Every structure is written in structure tokens, then in C-alpha cells.
Amino acid sequence: IVGGQEASPGSWPXQVGLFF
């Protein structure tokens, strides 16, 4: 699931990451 939150699980802080 594509997420646009910061410091989301499985993603880089401050950037748009993916929810895995």
C-alpha cells in the first residue's frame, strides 16, 4: 500500500515511503 506519511514503517524518515 502506497503511503505518503513521514517515518512510516519500512520507509525512510522524512520522505514518502511504502507501508509494508
Swiss-Prot record:
Enzyme Commission number(s) from the entry: 3.4.21.32
Catalysed reactions, semicolon-separated: Hydrolysis of proteins, with broad specificity for peptide bonds. Native collagen is cleaved about 75% of the length of the molecule from the N-terminus. Low activity on small molecule substrates of both trypsin and chymotrypsin
GO MF annotations in UniProt: serine-type peptidase activity
GO-annotated biological processes: collagen catabolic process; proteolysis
Domain Peptidase S1: 1-20
Enzyme class of the recorded protein, top EC level: hydrolase
Keyword terms, alphabetized: Collagen degradation, Hydrolase, Protease, Serine protease
Function comment: This enzyme is a serine protease capable of degrading the native triple helix of collagen.
The family this protein is said to belong to: Belongs to the peptidase S1 family.
Full protein name: Collagenolytic protease 28 kDa
Organism: Paralithodes camtschaticus
